[in-house]
UniProtKB/Swiss-Prot annotation:
Protein name: Chondroitin proteoglycan 4
InterPro entries xrefs: CPG4 (IPR029153), CPG4-like (IPR053123)
Keyword Ubl conjugation attached: no
Keyword Glycoprotein: yes
Pfam families in UniProt: CPG4
Keywords for this protein: Glycoprotein, Proteoglycan, Signal
Bias (Low complexity) ranges: 484-500, 633-647, 654-669
Organism of this sequence: Caenorhabditis briggsae
Domain of life per record: Eukaryota
Amino acid sequence: MLRVNLLILLCFVPFSLNNPLPTLPPDTANAYLRSFLPWWPNNTDFSLRAAPTPSESENSTEAVLLGAEYENGTDSTTGNQEDLDPATLRVQALPDSPLDALSPENAPKSFVSESMNHHDGNFIINFDEMGECPRDCSNDLREALGIVLQDMSHVERYHRICEKYSNASTCVNEDGRCDKDDRGMFEMMTSGLHYMCVEQELAFNATIKCIDDEAGLVQSECDAQCQTKNLFMNWMMRTAFQDTIQQGVNGIVGAATGTNANPLAFLQGAEGAAGGTPTGWADMLATVEQRPPSPQDAQQGFENFRQFTNDLCRIGDCMLDCIRSKFNTRCEGSAGTLLSEVFVRPIAASQNKLSILRPVLGSFMPEQCNYLTNNADLKKHRIDSTMDEELKRMYAEKMAKEIRDRNAQDELLSNLVPLDENGVPLPRALPELKSVDSPLDVSVKTLDQLILDMYSKNETKKAETTKKSYPNTTTVAPKNDDQAANTTAETTKTTSANITHVETTTLGNPKTEEVLSDVSLDTSGNNSTVADSGEGSAEGAGEGTEEDAEYSGSGNESTTEEEYSGSEEVSATDEGHPLAADESNEGLLTGSGEPAEEASGTGNSSVEGSGSGLDSLRSYIETSGEASGGAPGEASGEASGEASGEVSGEEEFSGYSGESPGENESSGEVPLTTTLHELY
């Protein structure tokens, strides 16, 4: 509450006093002002008053400044109005400040032109004097001109200028108040911006970064080559305001160091206050129209204009050549040509529009400025039409390629599987792909299920051995255990006539053991029968031996086929018996022709690796029956000869039969072997 009362009191105190601001003496006021304004003069009659009362001197001063008639109400002696001549007015008794602007309201109309009344800080182009269309649409162009002078990178400046130009162009084209002439003038003045921002936008987008990087070095090299600094320094030395500028610099430096309290005293003039010759800026402006120019001054001014214009045109020509060559060398071979076209295209457009003024301009323009009025001289700074079209095509294709690559990259990135917070791929990222079961996917199957699946697959696949292909082998259908046992027994009974003693060892099938034991008991009875049979019997025995070899080979082949099927096997091996040799080595004998020839002990006996075992047995029985009726004389000789050959052949065959177990071992199974010994 106390704070609120204090605030109300402070608000009403100023209004309760007649003179809240005390009157300060001039010395105090001047000292106060000099603390903030070092250039404020010492001897200035100035005071702060709450309600100032105008005096006669002040009234006369206001009359001088405003250039109007003022009647002094306090003076009763003079009531006549005086006509003031603006040409004789001078600014007196007021300190000058660099912050004071010479406004049209308080300045004499004699030296302020009407066109400068609303200059708005721009003395080059008065946008306010334009028509409605150019004036309203020129705001963006005005901002674009300001952007050129701002401190920023060329990349940012390029984009901002193009943005402003686009807005101004849209305004001119869409505003109904803009007629054809307005649009034509706008296009002529902004043709360089149109070329940079529209026609060759892709080229400038690709080269503006390089231009920004190399601009500082190129500018320094071109300044040294064209001697621009020397030219401007020369013209500064030749100006008529050299002394005035020097005095101003000295005064500012003195004010900064405290040695000079009024650095701008040279603007007021030493004799201005006393009514002498005007030497200050205001005095010079006030009397400029009173001194008509002499012919010598006009001639000198024209010569100065031609010389200055000649130097400017020379520097412009040199800078265009230098910029074009330097930037072409550093930035893709075309940046300098593009920049040169931006600068000279408005000049070329103005030459086409103002072709009538060419002779007039050429009459007083120096030779160095011929490229401003002559298309032939300007052509060296312009881009060739073929190169212009080629640059458009090249950068258009480059942009299209970048767009395709960017789209392909975006498509590739979109197809990548995003990961969750644990780094696991999200399955919803690929909805078009079907999920595939993986043994490593523990989220689908447990470890026990994986192990069971692996062993179940191994059980279904039996251990299979590689079957060797024998081109000359005739396959016989496998027999069951009873048929195999009967066949072995019958063959043993038939061939046991030539064997004195047989020791049988049976491994494996018990049925085969019983049959073989019965065959050994009947051997003695069969020996006497075979001895009385004669020649036919002997020949039959020999032929039977061959047939036995054929049958035993077929039987062995059947046994081999049974081995591959995983069944039990019975093989007989005997060095002197053809049955043992045939049964144990049929795989090798029938696989190639050479072992078969070695197995035939004589030329009359041959072992064939084909035929059925049952057919061989039937043919043997029929042959033995027919041979029983033959001559007994031939039996003894032929039997002995053939028997000896048979024995030797069978021995040779039995030597080769030793390789049969190895062949059986290669099948991956252990065969059951029945061995017969005791040769006769």
